[in-house]
């Protein structure tokens, strides 16, 4: 995962101080891109141990169109708890936009289902795109995430905003545009999540996984993560693991947690860091 370390080092060494919504402060750059060949291993960071269980359950939760943390909590995943209401609701975040985008006449669009059909029948299309950025439902920054949910808005605006697929010579590639990226805590999750999603969609459309391309807008290191960043940059990357997926699953909505097996994952110890809310 040298690509990830290069991103981290670039922002640490070349970023500029910038204030942010959380009040923590960041070192930030605007515009950066990484590329991962998924045939060369599963891109899970090895210079600190990552919690793959949370990544898989969150992705399945998105694909199921869910926006309440009950499923996550029932599976020991707490990564969304800080923004949810007392009843566990997060408003129309990723899952709702992926599976139930508001359309005309009160109807909704299932972007994921449409994407699968397009890849199968129009693989050369330049419209193989999923968007989670719905301006009408973005939260009001002057009130809390919970109050936004009560007003029918998202608890948080989507950070990983839009992704596009590309089919060439039987291989499926994906490019993600991420408008805002917490490099130390969030980006390892994002890389693994979209790499896995690409592999899943490739399987159900009869393709091989290609590249995952990760494009950033505001890529930042929080000021209270810089010590941890220095620690991680001193570590040497280990060989990438592989991800085995149950080959019997042919429906993108048919996957469950037990259909995934991470193999040969070696990682340096976890590095704790505070979350900026």
Swiss-Prot record:
Gene3D superfamilies: Thymidylate synthase/dCMP hydroxymethylase domain. Its main location: cytoplasm. Keywords: Cytoplasm, Methyltransferase, Nucleotide biosynthesis, Transferase. One of its GO terms (biological process) is dTTP biosynthetic process. GO terms for molecular function: thymidylate synthase activity. It is found in: Cytoplasm. Its EC number is 2.1.1.45. DUMP binds at residues 21, 126-127, 179-182, 190, 220-222. It is an enzyme of class 2 (transferase). The keyword rRNA-binding does not apply. One of its GO terms (cellular component) is cytosol. The active site is at 159 (nucleophile). The keyword Methyltransferase applies. Belongs to the thymidylate synthase family. Bacterial-type ThyA subfamily. Catalyzes the reductive methylation of 2'-deoxyuridine-5'-monophosphate (dUMP) to 2'-deoxythymidine-5'-monophosphate (dTMP) while utilizing 5,10-methylenetetrahydrofolate (mTHF) as the methyl donor and reductant in the reaction, yielding dihydrofolate (DHF) as a by-product. This enzymatic reaction provides an intracellular de novo source of dTMP, an essential precursor for DNA biosynthesis. Homodimer. This is Thymidylate synthase. It comes from Teredinibacter turnerae (strain ATCC 39867 / T7901). The lineage of its organism: Bacteria, Pseudomonadati, Pseudomonadota, Gammaproteobacteria, Cellvibrionales.
């Amino acid at each position: 995962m040298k690509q990830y370390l290069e991103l981290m080092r670039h922002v640490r060494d070349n970023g500029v101080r910038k204030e942010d919504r959380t009040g923590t402060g960041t070192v930030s750059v605007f515009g950066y891109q990484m590329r991962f060949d998924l045939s060369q291993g599963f891109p899970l960071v090895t210079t600190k141990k990552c919690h793959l269980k949370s990544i898989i359950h969150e992705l399945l939760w998105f694909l199921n169109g869910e926006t309440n943390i009950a499923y996550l909590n029932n599976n020991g995943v707490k990564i969304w708890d800080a923004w949810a209401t007392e009843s566990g609701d997060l408003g129309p975040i990723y899952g709702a936009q992926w599976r139930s985008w508001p359309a005309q006449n009160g109807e909704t669009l299932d972007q994921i289902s449409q994407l699968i059909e397009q890849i199968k029948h129009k693989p050369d299309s330049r419209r193989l795109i999923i968007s989670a950025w719905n301006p009408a439902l973005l939260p009001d920054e002057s009130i809390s995430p919970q109050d936004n949910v009560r007003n029918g808005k998202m608890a948080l605006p989507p950070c990983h905003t839009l992704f596009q697929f590309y089919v060439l010579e039987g291989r499926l590639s994906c490019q993600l545009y991420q408008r805002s990226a917490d490099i130390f805590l969030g980006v390892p999750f994002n890389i693994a999540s979209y790499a896995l999603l690409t592999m899943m969609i490739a399987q159900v459309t009869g393709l091989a996984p290609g590249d995952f391309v990760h494009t950033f807008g505001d890529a930042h290191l929080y000021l209270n993560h810089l010590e941890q960043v220095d620690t991680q940059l001193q570590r040497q990357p280990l060989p990438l693991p592989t991800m085995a997926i149950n080959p019997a699953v042919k429906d993108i909505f048919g996957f469950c947690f037990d259909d995934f097996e991470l193999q040969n994952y070696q990682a340096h110890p976890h590095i704790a860091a505070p979350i900026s809310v």
